[in-house]
Every structure is written in C-alpha cells, then in structure tokens.
Design a protein with these regions (language model features):
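Terminal targeting signals and extreme-terminal segments of soluble enzymes
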Residues: 1-70, 76-134
Length: 134
C-alpha cells in the first residue's frame, strides 16, 4: 500500500523522524483490518486488538518527498491469542525500514485478552507469509 509522508514527519536533520515510521506501519495495519477490500467483517478483529510490542529496524534514512512510501504487510506467528504483523517500507523502491508488531485480540467488556476465533484465523491466514502456515 502507498503511505504519504507528512511535512510534520520531518525532523531537524531534514529526514523523516524515526517515530513517524510506526505511524506508517499503523496506517498499513488499519488498512488491512478495517479498510481492505477483502475484509468482509467476518472477524472480531475490528472490535478489539491491541499492540503488545513493536520492533523496528532502520536500514537507511528517508528524506521528505511528495511521492508516497510503499509499505508491504503480512502476518506470521498466529497463535491462540496473538499474532504478528510484519512490515517492509520502501522509499523509491529501496528498502528503508522493517518492523513487526505483536497484536493481541481483546474483549474490552471484560478488559482481558481473548482467543482468536476460527473465523479470525481464516482471515489472518489470507495474509500469512508462505513459510509460516497456521
């Protein structure tokens, strides 16, 4: 997916600040779970998932440009009550940042983590990395 840079993402060193990349990853994740055309609302993921942790690795700096960045997103590590989203962010076709987010489904009424439903696992398997079948 394409993610635009914002002028305010730039820091005093004239490149995109490191914290902005978590926002770009969030944009890709929201698109996958909420806005993606293949999402037919068969899962409860839209009703509650929370971030348990992030990992991010910066491969090269990114300077502000009107051309949007390209973010690839996929899923791995589907477990009973958690899964991981992975990201690769490209600037002008060059890999600039990689990252991952551990996500946990939550029952907000009980304020507790919950297990993934079979339907949610089917949905997540659509975006599973080929080497990580669940």
């Amino acid at each position: 997916m394409h993610v635009p840079m914002r002028w305010s993402d730039m820091d005093a060193y004239q490149h995109i600040n490191n914290v902005a990349f978590l926002g770009y990853f969030e944009t890709a994740r929201v698109d996958l779970f909420f806005d993606h055309p293949t999402h037919d609302d068969e899962t409860g993921l839209r009703r509650g998932i929370v971030v348990a942790s992030h990992e991010i690795a910066y491969k090269r700096s990114v300077e502000y440009d009107a051309e949007p960045l390209q973010v690839q997103i996929w899923v791995s590590g589907i477990r009973a009550a958690a899964f991981t989203c992975h990201y690769e962010l490209f600037d002008h076709g060059q890999l600039a940042v990689t990252g991952s987010t551990l996500l946990v489904p939550v029952d907000f009424a009980l304020n507790r983590p919950r297990r993934l439903t079979p339907e949610e696992k089917v949905f997540l398997n659509r975006y599973l990395d080929d080497g990580d079948a669940a």
